[in-house]
Amino acid sequence: VNTSVPFPSTTRAILAQLIAFDTTSSRSNLDLIRWIEAYLAQHGVTSSLTFNAEGTKANVYATIGPAGVAGICLSGHTDVVPTTGQPWTADPYTLVERDGKVFGRGTADMKGFIACVLAAVPAFLAGVREVPLHLAFSYDEEVGCVGVRGLLAALAKEPVKPLAVIIGEPTLMHVARGHKGKQAYRVVVEGRAGHSALTHLGVNAIEYACDLISFLRNKANTLRDEGPHDEAYEPAYSTIQTGKVSGGIAVNVIPERCEFDFEIRHLPSDDVVAMIDEVSAFARETVEPQMRAVDPACGVHFQRISAYPGLLGRGAHGLQRFCCGLTGFQDMITLSFGTEGGLFEAMDIPAIVCGPGSIEQAHRPDEFIELDQLARCDAFMQDLLTAVAKPGFKLD
């Protein structure tokens, strides 16, 4: 990072810089992290980094205000989804302003929020008193909330953890009290190859995979029809779907291998472990015995691809009321997408989700955020500072 070049100071200018870093989850985010680290250092703020095992990606954490005191954490992820194959009308990594909007990959999800936080740093430094503000920016949220786990593990070793966390995912600045959790699995079915004229001598991996997929489909229908239901969510029940299948080499060859990926998006109150146990029990007790009657070497293997918990809003009533007061929106919402909030909540750090922009613009070509949304988030930061700077500030 060239620290001889003046850093931008406005939200829009900072966002332009953040967008210029291609932080697709498959790439390193270190250039962006080093830029944030240098930006904070220029303002006298010390950062700490936690890296992935390869040292190619990092989270950044910083505290503005007194050390060793629990404060409000402002959290977001630095990675973005790919642009490959999407029909963008301009360079996705160059911020373009048009019709009261700024376009670029990550504008809504969620570098707009990070830009608002960074633009507010000088004001935070001037105004914070007894209660600090913490900044937490992670890597690889888009591929299963991977990076934040290392950040939280580091926080768990500290004498004091944050009082609460605001996750800045796009909610149009409404306060979201909860969201569903998710688990994604890859299932590998290993059969026995052979000539298709002699099907009785082989074990058709695709057909047995279909038995498992049908079981998942039936379970999904049961959840839809019998619940449990929570009308705060859309849809109001936990869902199961198979999203990818591959297997076989030719129509006249008994397929030796088939693999498929499925996911469960579950209500925060649902027991997802029990759901997974049902599927694995069906594989173990019904599918594998049929396969192994022909060849004992056949079998079914489950591999978890990604997982994050739902956000229940446990212990967050004070935080919810406080943030609703800051936004001016008294009606809280729930989210159909996931965030890192449930992982903070699992550490007994109350969490809500509130940030600028709309999830409807995320992951799409010509992703954008309205300038009015950035202005609302800027105002939120100032109001947050005013509130926490008051003597004796408490959330409850």
Describe the role of every protein-language-model region.
Residues 48, 73, 134-136, 301:
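A structural signal for isolated positions on well-ordered beta-strands in alpha/beta enzyme cores
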Residues 110-184, 395-396:
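Acidic/histidine-rich catalytic neighborhood of metal-dependent amide-processing enzymes
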Residues 2-85, 257-261, 278:
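N-terminal helical capping/dimerization or prosegment-like subdomains
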Residues 55, 78-79, 101, 136-145, ...:
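Acidic, glycine-rich active-site loops and adjacent beta-strand->loop/helix elements
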Residues 98-100, 120-135, 159-161, 216-226, ...:
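Phosphate-handling active-site elements
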Residues 53, 186-396:
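Metal-dependent amide/peptide-bond hydrolase catalytic core
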Residues 71-134:
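Active-site metal-coordination/substrate-binding segment of hydrolases
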Residues 83-98, 162, 177-189:
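Acidic-glycine-rich active-site phosphate/pyrophosphate-binding loop
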